[in-house]
Every structure is written in structure tokens, then in C-alpha cells.
């Protein structure tokens, strides 16, 4: 249990890798651009959708029959969305998350939904998360709760999990204009502290060292040691042995 899908978009490829090791790789549709990711670090890329025909589609109904669920991702909107029902991430007729209108985020399922009257700040990266369990839905923006409600329950559909539109609010269409980064899906309900850590950058869904990023020649995540996770440039602690 835990992370069941993670797309950091650092590979800049027509097939974007799922780093959760579940093999749910995404197919990049249209001609999206690759831009700097939310962290600003070298090698951190994001995907920029044009709002016309760009999307990322998978071949799996990832969100079926989940008693608990967490969706976590970053978005950047260059301008306010035009029109309604702009899909961000989800699975048509099961779990649909997007902009129901230009200023309202919506998490919708056949078992219940929540509308949150806020919009991400234009031209700034915003971390968005939804946590679902037996108590209901909680929506976060930049680590802060912006909406919550009771209800809900496991849902399912025959559609596939997609990002950026094209099978989220409807079978096709409803494309999102903007950039997206670090999409993660969990089959557990993350805690408020977990969400705050993702939003602050103190945590990432998993270490990215399993993926070769263009230009990256060394990486020290400090996960209990000071080893270079992708090479042999291991560090040596000076003055302390407290590596947590």
C-alpha cells in the first residue's frame, strides 16, 4: 500500500515514466512543452499543456474501488482558465478533479463531491492535494486546508486515469491550460503533516535517483547517509555524525 502512481515529468519524453514502479506510464498527447519544474532545481522539469489538445493518458483505471485516496500535484496557470470543466487529474465517471469554473476547484465522484471557491495564484506554482477517507474529503492548497466535507466512498469506472484533460470531466476534451508537475496518487490517506511536507518541498513522493535526468551528475538525498545516489561521489561527514 502507499504510492500507486508518480509522474515527475523529468524525462521529457513522449512516454512519461511512472516512478512508483507500478508501470502506469503515461502517453503524452498533442505537443506540450517542457518547462522548469516547481522546485527550480536543475533537471526538474514540468509539462506545459496548451489547453487545446495536450494531455497525458494512461491505460489503467487507477482510481477504482479505493477506500482511501490521496491526490498530490503542482500546477501553474499563466492566466485564468476560460470556460468551465477544465480537467486537471482524474478518471472520468469515477474521480474527477479540476476547475468547474474559472474560480472554483471541484473534486467530484458519484458518491459525493466538494467545490472550493478559490483559484491558484496566477503565474505561481501552487501545490494542490485532496485526501479521501471514511470521514470524507479534504482539499489542500499549499499545505493549508481550503475545503472539507463528509460523505463519499469507493467508486469505479471503465475509464482510465489521465492528466491535463481528455478523459477527466468527460470522455474527451476539457483541456487544461497551464503547467503541471510531480503528480502523485496514493491508495492511503496522507496526514496533514505529510501534505505540508510535500507542499513545502521538504518531501517528494519518492527519491528521483531511479531516473536519469539530463545534466544530473550527482545527487545526495541525505536519506540516512551521505552517499551519491546516482554515482560514486559519496560524501564524508565532517564535525558530526548525525545523519537523519
Residue spans of the language-model regions?
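Extracellular glycan-recognition modules
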Residues: 4, 16, 29, 50-106, ...
